[in-house]
Amino acid sequence: MADNDRLLSIIERITDPRINLTDKNTIDPDGLPLPALTNVGMGTVFEELLRRFNEENNEEAGEHFTPRDAISLLAHLVFEPVKEDLPKIITLYDPACGSGGMLTESREYLLDLGVRSAAIQLSGTEINPETYAICKSDLIIKGVDPSGIHWGNTITDNSFSDKSFGYMITNPPYDKSWKEDKKKIYHEKMLLDHRFELTLTNYIGEEEVLDSTPRTSDGQLLFLLEEVDKMKPLEFQPQGSRIASIHNGSSLFTGDAGSGESNIRRYLIEKDLVEAIIQLPNNIFYNTGISTYVWMLTNKKKDNRKGKVQLIDASQAFEKLRKNQGSRNCTIEPYRTDILRVYTDFVEQEANEELKVGSKIFDDDDFRYYNVTIECPLRLRCQFNSLKIDEMLYDSSDIEVSKWLYNTYKDRVFSGLDSEIPAIKEYLNDQEIKITDKKLNKLISAKAWKDRQRLMNAAKVLMKDIGTDVYMDYNLFSTKVNATAKELKLETSAAELKTICRAMSVTDSKATPVVKKEHKANSKDVVMLLETYGVPEDKLSDYGYHLVKKGMYVEFESDSELRDSEKIPVKEDIYDYFQREVRPYVEDAWINLTQTKIGCEISFNKYFYKPTPLRSLKENERDIIALDEQSQGYIKSLFELM
C-alpha cells in the first residue's frame, strides 16, 4: 500500500471519528451513538468486502473468487482421509492463492482437528498486487505469519524451487492466456523450466523427455504440474502429499494425443497420482456458471486405490440459495458429507433423486488410448493438358494473387517487381487480402517466375512428344515423362519432372496406386517394423508394405485427403481393432504404425450420461387430443380431409 501511495489515505479513513472499528460503544462528533464492531460483525464485513472486491477484480477470463463452501469441501477432501495420521509439521501451499481463502479455511479445519497453530505453515503465490495485499492483511488480522505468501508469477517464477509441501489446495485461473509468460520460460524454442518437462514412454516403450506445456490460450494445467513438482517425497513425509485442485472441463479432454494437455493427463494417470476427479455443480462461483472439477492427487495411494481412478458426479448435489450472488445461485454445503462419504468409502453408486452423488471406479488404462493413423493409397489419373500447363506459370500457394500480378504487370514479373511493392500492397489492402511480407516477396520473386516459366515450357515440349493420352497408372506416366525428357535432353531435374507429372494429375479412385518406394526385405524400414514394432512378416501389407516378389516390398504413397485417425483404447490390440472396424469398409487401407501416439482424456459425459427416455405413443396421443380440444376440433378435421 505504501508503494502505491495508499497507506496514508487508508489510515486516515480507519481513524475517522465517524467510524467505530473498536469493540466498545462510542459517540461520533455529532453526538450520535456508534455501536461497537463485534468479531462476528467484523467477519461479515470482511467477507462481503472480499466478495465484492474479487467480483470486480477478477475480470479476466478464468479468474474466480472461490466461495467458502467449495473451499471447505476441498479442505475436507484433502485432510479427512488422513486426519488420524497427520505429520508433526503441516506444510500447506496454494500456487494461486488469491485472497488466501484456501489457506485460511484449511488452517481453521486443522485447528478444529486439534492441530497446534505453530505446526501449520502456510505458503502461497499471488500475481495480482491488490489481491496479494488482501491475503497478507487477512493473515495478519488472524494472527498468522504471512511471510510464506509471495507476490509473483507461478508460471515464470519458481519461487519455491527449494521447497516441497505436504498438502496443496488451489483454484487456478482457467481459459486464461499465458502467451507473454511463455516467452520468459523459453530460450528461442528451448524450454528452460524443468517443471513442465515430463518423461513419458512412446508406443514402442522408449522413454522421451517431452515439453508438455499446453496451448498458450489456457495455462491452468501448468499449476497442476507446479503442485506435482512440489510434492514431498515419501522419504521426507511417509504419509505422502495430497493435492486438491479445481479446474474446468477443458483440463479433462482438451488436446489431441501428443499435445501438452494430453501428455500432462497421461503423466498423472501413468504415475498413478490421480485418486479421484469430482464434478461440482454449475453456478457455485460468483462470476461464472461453468462446470468445474476437483482433481484429487496423492503420491501415496491406499492399496485398494492403486491403479484406479474414481470419478464422482456431484453436479446435482446442491441446494438453491434464496438470493443469487452474481452468477452463484446454489451451495454444496448440505451435500458435503455425502461427497466425502462416497470419496472416502471408495464405492460405486448411481445418482438418483435420493442419492445426489454418483460414483464410478475405473482402471488407469480406461482413459488412455492409441491415436493411430490410417492411410489409403494415392491414386492418380494423368494426362497432358494445355490449360493445366498454362496454370504452371502461377504460384500454387496463391494462384489468384499470382494471376493478378501477371495480368497487371505482364512480362515485368520476370525482371522483378520490387518497385511496385507499395502499389501491390495498396491493391491487397483494398481487396482485404492479408499476406505477410515474406510471402509477398516470394510471390514477386523474379527467379521463381523464371523457374515456373521454364517448367511450363518444358511441359509443353513433353506434351508435344507424348501427346494427350490418359494414363490410369501414375507410375507408367512418370516413367514415360522421365524417359522422354532424357531423350529430348531437357535440362530438368528429377524433382522438376515430378512437379510436371503432379501438375498433370488428378485423383481418381479407379487409378492404380502411386508407388512411393521399393524396399528389400532387409531394408531398415522393413526391419524396423518386424523387429522394433513386432509386426508379423505375413501382415506387413496391413502396415503399408506389399510383397511384390520374394525379398521385395513396395510402399505406396498415401493420399492426405483420405488419411484418418482412430482412437483405440490401450486395452485393445491395434491390429484386431483395424481388422474389425476399418478393413471391412476400406479394403486398401493400412496402419501407419510409426506415427502412433498415446493420448489420455477423461469424459464425464461419456461415463455419466443418462439419455432422456422417449415419450410413449399414448403420451403423444393424449397431448394431441388436448391440443385438438383447445383448437375446437381443427386438428381432427385436418385428419378427416386426408
Predicted regions and their residues:
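Conserved S-adenosyl-L-methionine
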Residues: 60, 64-170, 174-190, 248-250, ...
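Short glycine/proline-rich turn/loop motifs
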Residues: 51-58, 203-208
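Short coil/turn segments at secondary-structure boundaries
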Residues: 1, 23-33, 57-65, 360, ...
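Short acidic-aromatic active-site loops that bind/stabilize oxyanions
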Residues: 35-39, 60-68, 210-217
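A conserved structural/catalytic subdomain of Rossmann-like adenosyl-cofactor enzymes
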Residues: 162, 167-636
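Long recognition/docking surfaces used for binding and targeting
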Residues: 1-54
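Non-catalytic, well-ordered alpha-helical scaffold segments
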Residues: 4-8, 12, 39-43, 47, ...
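Amphipathic, well-packed alpha-helical segments that form the structural scaffold of globular domains
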Residues: 15, 46-54, 75-79, 107-108, ...
